[in-house]
Amino acid sequence: FSNQMLASLAEAIQVSTSPKEKSKNKDIFYWAEGSLAFGKVRETDTSSKKKIYTDGITIGADKFTDDREIKGLAFRYSQNDVKVGIDGSRLDTDTYNLTYYSTTPVKDDKRFLDAVVGIGALYSDISSVLDGNKLTGNRNGKQIYGTLKLKEEIKKDELTLIPAAQIDLGYTLLSSYSESGKTAMRFDKQSIQSRNLRLSIASVETLNNKKYKMKRHGKIEYRANLHRSSNIKYSYISDSSTKYDTELNSGALHNINGEVGIDVIYDDNFSLFFIYELNEALGKGYTQKIHLAIGYLPQKNTNFAFKIEAD
């Protein structure tokens, strides 16, 4: 699997809450979002360049509580296509995720605790080209992941600054599979753990008029990738008596991530999202991504959006 698929199992992006009436606190608000993302990963000494394309759809429901807490449940289906190198190798994956999330005020409605926990399933078609020989296979996987994020909102007029600290934990179990083709190999089950510590500062500026609400936002983040290795056990189908065990090291300990974007919500409750993201793995390379999304909030009085991306 590519580094990009394992880099972030769940990320909660930009929470804003403003229920207009206390009587609406117990309502359930439904929403839907379709998204596209595409990007590139630079070639390094140990890995080939990659082109990434992802499209998906998410549906969810949010509930306000009497304590101004928000709880939600979302289901996401996405297709992830990764082209590796120039010889035709690729990884195509269908991903299904079910995610529970909440945001809870912990101090004067200025400090919040966000929590995310979810499960996922992966179904992958793998095609590798080595020395002109094409090898193919199918592999499945299961995921569990969670995030805790403590943030504070510092507001001045239409500008909000949001310093935050976050920890991500994830576990992925990949099934065994066998390739077909010349020099094919058989791979054993593989477990992958992820642990990330993040420190960030984000800014959100609100610009409204009679036709739409617009938010310009940006973020810079330091991410410590605390677990970057996994063991791959395999053998050649033509000689199953010899077993190989290779440690796969991916990513960098220190990472700097930045993003800028615009969110536009129209009076008819359709919304448009655009985000440009640059992730620099210090000493290893960088990844660029562009995210485009269209969302829909059915209720006219819904002022809450919680966007989730799980890869």
What do the PLM-derived regions correspond to, one by one?
Residues N25-D311:
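Membrane translocator/pore-forming domains, dominated by Gram-negative outer-membrane beta-barrels
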